[in-house]
Amino acid sequence: MAGSEEQWPRRREDGDPDAAAAPLQDAELALAGINMLLNNGFRESDQLFKQYRNHSPLMSFGASFVSFLNAMMTFEEEKMQLACDDLKTTEKLCESEEAGVIETIKNKIKKNVDARKSTPSMVDRLQRQIIIADCQVYLAVLSFVKQELSAYIKGGWILRKAWKIYSKCYVDINALQELYQKKLTEEPLASDAANDNHVVAEGVTEESLSRLKGAVSFGYGLFHLCISMVPPNLLKIINLLGFPGDRLQGLSSLTYASESKDMKAPLATLALLWYHTVVRPFFALDGSDNKGGLDEAKAILLRKESAYPNSSLFMFFKGRIQRLECQINSALTSFHTALELAVDQREIQHVCLYEIGWCSMIELNFKDAFDSFERLKNESRWSQCYYAYLTAVCQGATGDVDGAQLVFKEVQKLFKRKNNQIEQFSVKKAERFRKQTPTRALCVLASIEVLYLWKALPNCSFPNLQRMSQACHEVDDSSVVGLKHLLLGAIHKCLGNSQDALQFFQRAARDELCRQSNSYVPPYACYELGCLLLDSAETVGRGRTLLLQAKEDFSGYDFENRLHVRIHAALASLRELVPQ
């Protein structure tokens, strides 16, 4: 497909009378390339974009995006550097062709110039500005991956620049759409012929404006959505950079982008699926409602089913929905199918393997979980330290404690990302079992612990939750009493036993020993207590006080930022119900 030039548009010269149509044909070509990528044609998509890289700024961006995606899925240094170089090349191409702005002005002055000729330069100018902002966002992401202070600062300022471009383009395109509609519905006055706005609108089509609105709405919506989840302790920095954070605006913009004919429409669809099936449950954005967002996600999959019949990514999200609905066997089937569909896409296979490992842990099938995590430990470049910890925990939970201890000893050696909270947690937890042989009971407890921290307990069936409760009660170790009570509280909460959950959370919050060995237990227990008390009108005030206490009275514990996002979401939902 990629090799057949006849089916794609040739490069238009400026003097070509059909040049005004070129941007839309570029958009169709770029959209076809992205759709190809999502239907498991990663190589074909890469070849297509490379073949037409010099065809237009849009195709150059498509090639750079595929390069960026490849870098983010592998985390290989050389691929990340190549992606940076490609994105900068695309950015320079767009900036160099900004002569279109001057050309527009010249066309306005020259009365004998065909009015249509000003149109592509204006449409192109907006397109190039959006591409520049997109490139800057991806460059910032590549910078953040380095996890160095200077990289964070640099990335922050790059994002600030990108946001200003998105914001201006969004306003400009909305204004043009309004002007276009006005032009269609009103009889133009003679004086309008001399009006700049009339000249700008001349020749602009509804289709081109709609596509441009879709193009800018992807980045504009992502900014709003991501910033809306930032906890208060980071909001000062965010506000300093001038970023907004309106969740509803973000979702609305991404939905518009997903239904547009822009090349990023499929990416906006994936972003919405990611938000509804991963972000919302993980950060508890819907409070105790563990199925929030599932109806929206299912509706998206239903609408897009015919366009992506064999997409490993869409099959992956189908599995996510099934997992959140506690249909673990169905979820496992979907993840295994996605794994097979992604035969040439190692990174997508790894994402599927990760979910298979988690679903197996949810089912307390530690042998299958061990197989998945061990393969990830050996194959993935993302976080071998974390995968080694999960491998050891599951191996010990099967009863092979000697083999588990050998893997626990590997965790420290694989610790590379010093500022990564997940790796810090993995090393800290593995340290104890590196020095002394773990017991099967403690490894099972450790597996329940990660299920709790990753918000996976609500995905467990009642029989499995009861088995987990029994496993916690069987642990007789004074150093993990606080942790045991926290987990028992979470299990009883999922079982609907609110009073039992309340008592266990209170015990966990009071446990002094866990402040040294499991420092996150008291603030998390405090948060859980607060959330439980929010469910009753009589105890809402006490619940809010506990949430604020969890936020303000503790610091320096594992997954602090993660908890702050959840507290922020709980307080925000409370403000919606009871305005302060």
From Swiss-Prot:
The lineage of its organism: Eukaryota, Metazoa, Chordata, Craniata, Vertebrata. It comes from Mus musculus (Mouse). Transmembrane segments: none annotated. InterPro entries: Iml2/TPR_39, TPR-like_helical_dom_sf. Coiled coil: none annotated. Disulfide bonds: none annotated. It comes from the Eukaryota. This is Tetratricopeptide repeat protein 39C. Belongs to the TTC39 family. TPR repeats lie at residues 312-345, 350-383, 482-515. It holds the Pfam family Iml2-TPR_39. Keywords: Repeat, TPR repeat.
